């Protein structure tokens, strides 16, 4: 038998029983899910093994079950076989027991990104043949996406029932170096039970730190029409860390964005600027914010009574405090730079405020402030070095800057295009569309003799490369001239 069909060891079975009892005490429905996986045969032995496992779980106290057919290939993706299995389980197990909730299924086509939209697609087959009581998961237009009437209309018209929305937030399995503490938004507030039968939030691996987002999702589901993301977030901060709320808020407001994929707003109360656009009032306000950032970790450590939450946040808080320090120093350094009276003093302080390789490795492992704070530091240091070297030498230094139509091309991720390290790379985090572009700003008009683009992986299944692309150049950033014909599937 596959391992998934075997009984749990005694200790694990006891843990599940304990968890189920805790759920009952707290009015939470415990749902046990199984993923049949690649080894499914669709034969009678398979079916009886599954029923036996369901009965074992029933005896442990499980009264709600789900089957997942996501992220597999081969025979297991057959929607006709899936519906036959689900319908038979509903008849033989769910209805015969009498006290078991309706089944839930995650289809192979759980996102519009790759779902077959035709009447022959698996979703349409679900709609025509799947027992009406069975609830069907849906992640939206892409894997991580907002809950909108449009995406529900699209899927509901095919599965012929209100979808069960699987919201991939605040999960960070695609950005494990980030911990999401921002407001819960992107959930439409005009929906009702005719549009969806439920919503499930996929949390981070950090259980305690996920509670801020789960507090928002719970609030949304309790009263959809009245839900307000910011009001909920402000209340959640106080609920989770009442004795250090303001310091926690400082950390949370700068720990919202993913940098890639499912982008979230961050640092919306903070205004940053380039050194060339210096404004003393804005500089003082930004220094005060960096000062709060620098002090927040110690204040949180002092006031946080949830040891589990503190343990999860600590690696990020350590780097957050360092970000506050280097941000303050960058602003202080900018005053010396703008004064222009002591080159030696400026350069000594500049060198001391550079991030070492170890500093960067530590920050990359536990990032925050990615949308505004760290980019301010990076841009300020780059701008001052560029201006200083130009003034000293009288020549324009070589300076490459990543640009593009993708939103995160404006973040420090774009620097990874030109760091001379083949183990690091820039990724947009989203699929390319017609008209998307990525490029390099050379800083000034220069002769270019070679363009080298390293992309893709050593895999036949890889799709991370430009497709139907053209290499172009521009002198003014407005008029573009092709350098090549269209390039198709060239990994290079």
Task: Please place each PLM-identified region on the residue numbering.
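Substrate-binding cleft of carbohydrate-active enzyme catalytic domains
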Residues: 1-101
